[in-house]
């Protein structure tokens, strides 16, 4: 990424005069003052006034690092937040366990939420430090730590930002040559991604087709086995159904006989009850003759006892028959219930038979569909072979592109190394020339001091000479005046 051209101005004497030329031995870049760092970073649209740079806070360093990573590394704040979310998803099982503990201990819910916030902020801080460490390592600073973010020191921040400014200037100087290589590399990467995506898509398609073929073969085998089992089960049910029909016919005849016998016995019981009532009436009539004719009464009693014994015998027979009939009725009811269950089972069997016929129709359709799928599979196999050949050709192209890219990258690295060596040589020559210039300035200042001293001595001698000349003139004038007086 090219930076604004104002960051590097070789002819700007105001920036050069403010630069501090003392270099830390382990660093390969000059240490700049806070004012120059602020101007250079602001020219790159970073928030960096002199007060913030000279008195950095933790929050400002975090904001500045996010801006630097977004501009130079392409790692935005949204990317960092996405990484934090991925880390939180990986800890989801632990979070569920903690949630279960929170349900058992609800009084710890607030502290758990605070712990989650602390974990999120800590993960974000670690990811920010990793990205910044990688960037500063490229710039030449290999000792960037978390304390530089949490408790920044002005001198360390000054050194780190000096490395950033130096890196930005170097990129600005070589941006024209690097942009071509970057564009070529990006194009190669895009082609590589497209080919890889196509490769993965074809692989997934091949796997899906293999899975469908195996599933169809497995389903067909299961359907054949299930059909045989259903046929065997249906034949058994048909035999049982025939037996049940015969039993039903026999039980129906017995049930009709039972009904006739029951009706006959009920009629006979009614007749006996009627006879008992009539006998009771006759007994009431005979009571009046009890005392008048004991012999007749005795005979009647004997006859009645005989009739009673016969009636009791008949009654016992009827009761036993009644019990037997009740048991038969209950057994018939059970049989009838079983018949109803059997009819219901028969209906289910018939439904199963209809379903079986439907399944057979579907099976025929599936077999036809399978044949079509086999034809389609053959076509797909041919297509897969074609795609495989294309994939091999593409892989060869990718290898050639990678080889070309590596060669170009190696050439660009060599060129960058030579440019960096030239830059270091120029910096050293500039330092030597500046030292010579300082020596010349000191020599000139000494000469000016000597000239000023000589000038002052010359002025003093000049004034003394002028005074001597004035005295001499006055003596000459006085002498001439006296000589004129003597001549006159």
Swiss-Prot record:
The reply to whether Ribosomal protein figures as a keyword in the UniProt entry is no
Localization (cell): Nucleus; Chromosome, Centromere, Kinetochore
Q: What's one Pfam family the UniProt record gives for this protein?
A: Nuf2_DHR10-like
GO terms (molecular function) for this protein are: microtubule binding; protein-containing complex binding
**Can the keyword Protease be found in this entry's annotation?**
no
Residues of the region (Disordered) are 96-115
Supply the alphabetized keyword list. Cell cycle, Cell division, Centromere, Chromosome, Coiled coil, Kinetochore, Mitosis, Nucleus
Coiled-coil intervals, chain numbering: 186-479
- What's an example Gene Ontology biological process for this entry? cell division
Superkingdom field: Eukaryota
Ranges annotated as biased composition (Acidic residues) = 101-115
Describe the task this protein carries out: Acts as a component of the essential kinetochore-associated NDC80 complex, which is required for chromosome segregation and spindle checkpoint activity.
Protein name as catalogued: Probable kinetochore protein NUF2
């Amino acid at each position: 990424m090219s930076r604004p051209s104002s960051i590097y101005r070789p002819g700007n004497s105001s920036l050069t005069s403010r630069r501090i030329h003392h270099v830390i031995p382990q660093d390969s870049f000059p240490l700049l003052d806070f004012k120059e760092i602020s101007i250079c970073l602001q020219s790159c649209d970073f928030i960096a006034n002199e007060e913030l740079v000279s008195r950095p806070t933790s929050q400002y360093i975090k904001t500045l690092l996010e801006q630097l990573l977004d501009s130079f590394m392409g790692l935005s704040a949204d990317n960092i937040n996405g990484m934090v979310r991925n880390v939180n998803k990986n800890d989801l099982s632990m979070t569920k366990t903690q949630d279960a503990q929170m349900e058992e201990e609800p009084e710890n819910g607030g502290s758990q939420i605070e712990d989650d916030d602390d974990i999120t902020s800590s993960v974000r801080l670690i990811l920010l430090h990793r990205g910044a460490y990688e960037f500063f390592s490229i710039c030449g600073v290999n000792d960037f730590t978390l304390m530089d973010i949490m408790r920044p020191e002005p001198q360390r921040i000054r050194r780190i930002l000096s490395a950033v400014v130096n890196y930005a200037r170097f990129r600005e100087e070589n941006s024209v040559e690097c942009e071509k290589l970057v564009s070529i590399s990006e194009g190669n990467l895009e082609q590589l991604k497209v080919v890889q995506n196509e490769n993965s898509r074809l692989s997934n398609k091949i796997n899906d087709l293999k899975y469908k073929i195996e599933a169809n073969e497995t389903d067909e085998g299961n359907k054949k086995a299930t059909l045989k089992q259903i046929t065997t089960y249906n034949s058994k049910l048909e035999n049982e159904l025939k037996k049940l029909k015969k039993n039903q016919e026999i039980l129906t005849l017995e049930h009709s006989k039972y009904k006739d016998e029951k009706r006959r016995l009920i009629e006979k019981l009614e007749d006996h009850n009627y006879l008992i009532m009539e006998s009771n009436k006759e007994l009431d009539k005979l009571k009046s003759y009890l005392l008048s004719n004991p012999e007749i009464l005795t005979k009647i009693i004997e006859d009645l006892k005989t009739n009673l014994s016969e009636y009791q015998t008949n009654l016992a027979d009827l009761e036993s028959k009644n019990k037997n009939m009740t048991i038969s009725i209950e057994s018939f009811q059970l049989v009838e219930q079983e018949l109803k269950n059997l009819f219901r089972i028969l209906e289910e069997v018939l439904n199963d038979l209809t379903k079986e016929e439907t399944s057979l129709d579907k099976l025929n359709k599936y077999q036809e569909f399978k044949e079509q799928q086999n034809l389609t599979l053959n076509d797909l196999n041919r297509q897969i072979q074609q795609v495989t050949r294309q994939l091999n050709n593409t892989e060869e192209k990718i290898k050639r592109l990678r080889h070309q890219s590596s060669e170009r990258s190696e050439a660009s690295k060599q060129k960058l190394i030579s440019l960096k060596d030239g830059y270091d040589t120029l910096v050293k020559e500039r330092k030597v020339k500046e030292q010579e210039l300082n020596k010349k300035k000191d020599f000139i200042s000494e000469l000016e001091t000597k000239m000023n001293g000589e000038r002052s001595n010359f002025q003093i001698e000049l004034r003394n000479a002028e005074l001597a000349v004035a005295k001499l003139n006055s003596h000459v004038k006085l002498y001439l005046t006296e000589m004129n007086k003597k001549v006159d």
